[in-house]
């Protein structure tokens, strides 16, 4: 039986409940979210603009910044293009279906997927539907588009490439399904006519966009125990891709960086760090938010830890992002926590206007940080 894990740390909680029933855990309170103490706020986080776009968010929904616009979607079928300067809605399209992921933006298209296992391509300028096509099964990973292809990774881990012009299937790539997998904010990346995508059991592959053949493959994490839950080692978040290397994070695994030369990968460093949300990056520093709520900064060159903070233990953190020397991370109570990137000190805290947890990944832009909160509000914030 295939089981998909739907919350960031549901695997940990499920394991705790199981063992707790067997009286092996006596201190289940260790999984309770940390209570927040007052902090001395040395910065002020302001809302530049906000607009209501639909019905909240989910793990498969990630806003995208392109052409001075924010593109986003919500589970109720709403897809929008918003002016990044002022939050005005350029267009809003309501599809007659329930969506499972979005958005992918590229080749003049905005791509979403639905519960009927279909992908929809909308015109990025007008919001009008261009084409739709059937998938192997539903997809809860945001699609990606570019170089004449639309790429979808379905929940059976099949990667499919469709023609951007008409939605015709070009190729399909699949690996054996694991018993358990983590349903979280994993995303793909496009570079040099290749798509980089996570596949089961802690692996990341680069596939040629022309025919789906494997350019290279890395193993970011390995199973560490005998149980099915121990075997969950999925690569999470969006891989950090550089001209000569790639860095990944994984659940029950590591942050791992590789150098790439002539399609050959050489491990540079790895650091044990279990995450469900992926990495942030700025100025040769990698930032991570772990499954237990640790926020840490690592040197890109060698993985040395610059600083680490455990103030936000078990608070269901989002991916960390950087804007103008501050690190932003969201939590399960709809709060944004702001760190000084140099010292690792918490310098600010901000409510996004909803007590629901922030599930969609934070999006850094050159204008601030975009947040899609749990109540369907899209907003741009920044610290002053």
Swiss-Prot record:
Q: Which species is listed as the source?
A: Taylorella asinigenitalis (strain MCE3)
Q: What does this protein do?
A: Part of the outer membrane protein assembly complex, which is involved in assembly and insertion of beta-barrel proteins into the outer membrane.
State the SUPFAM superfamilies in the record. Answer: Quinoprotein alcohol dehydrogenase-like (SSF50998)
Query: GO terms for biological process?
Result: Gram-negative-bacterium-type cell outer membrane assembly; protein insertion into membrane
**What Pfam families does this protein's entry cite?**
PQQ_2
Q: Where is the lipid attached (N-palmitoyl cysteine)?
A: 22
Lipidated residues (S-diacylglycerol cysteine): 22
Protein location: Cell outer membrane
Instruction: State what protein this is by name.
Output: Outer membrane protein assembly factor BamB
């Amino acid at each position: 039986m295939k089981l998909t894990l739907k919350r960031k740390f549901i695997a940990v909680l499920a394991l705790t409940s199981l063992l707790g029933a067997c009286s092996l855990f006596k201190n289940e309170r260790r999984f309770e979210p940390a209570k927040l103490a007052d902090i001395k706020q040395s910065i002020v986080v302001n809302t530049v603009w906000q607009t209501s776009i639909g019905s909240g968010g989910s793990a498969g929904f990630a806003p995208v910044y392109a052409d001075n616009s924010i593109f986003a979607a919500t589970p109720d079928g709403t897809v929008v293009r918003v002016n990044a300067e002022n939050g005005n809605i350029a267009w809003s399209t309501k599809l007659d279906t329930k969506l499972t992921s979005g958005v992918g933006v590229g080749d003049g298209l905005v791509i979403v997927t639905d519960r009927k296992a279909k992908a929809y391509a909308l015109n990025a300028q007008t919001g009008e539907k261009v084409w739709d096509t059937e998938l192997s099964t539903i997809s809860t990973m945001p699609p990606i588009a570019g170089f004449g292809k639309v790429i979808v990774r379905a929940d059976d881990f099949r990667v499919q490439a469709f023609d951007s012009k008409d939605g015709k299937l070009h190729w399909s790539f699949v690996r054996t399904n694991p018993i358990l997998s983590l349903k979280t904010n994993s995303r793909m990346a496009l570079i040099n006519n290749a798509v980089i995508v996570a596949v089961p059991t802690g692996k990341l592959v680069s596939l040629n966009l022309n025919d789906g053949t494997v350019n290279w493959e890395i193993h970011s994490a390995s199973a560490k125990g005998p149980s099915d839950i121990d075997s969950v080692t999925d690569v999470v978040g969006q891989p950090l891709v550089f001209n000569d290397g790639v860095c990944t994070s994984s659940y029950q695994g590591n942050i791992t960086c590789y150098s790439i030369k002539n399609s050959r990968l050489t491990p540079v460093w790895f650091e044990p760090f279990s995450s469900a949300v992926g990495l942030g990056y700025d100025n040769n520093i990698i930032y991570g938010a772990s499954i237990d709520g640790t926020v840490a900064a690592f040197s890109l060159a060698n993985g040395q830890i610059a600083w680490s903070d455990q103030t936000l233990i078990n608070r269901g953190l989002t991916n960390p992002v950087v804007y103008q020397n501050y690190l932003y991370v969201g939590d399960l109570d709809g709060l944004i926590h702001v760190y000084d990137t140099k010292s690792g000190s918490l310098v600010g805290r901000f409510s996004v206007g909803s007590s629901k947890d922030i599930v969609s990944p934070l999006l850094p832009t050159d204008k601030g940080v975009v947040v899609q909160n749990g109540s369907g509000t899209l907003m741009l914030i920044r610290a002053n």
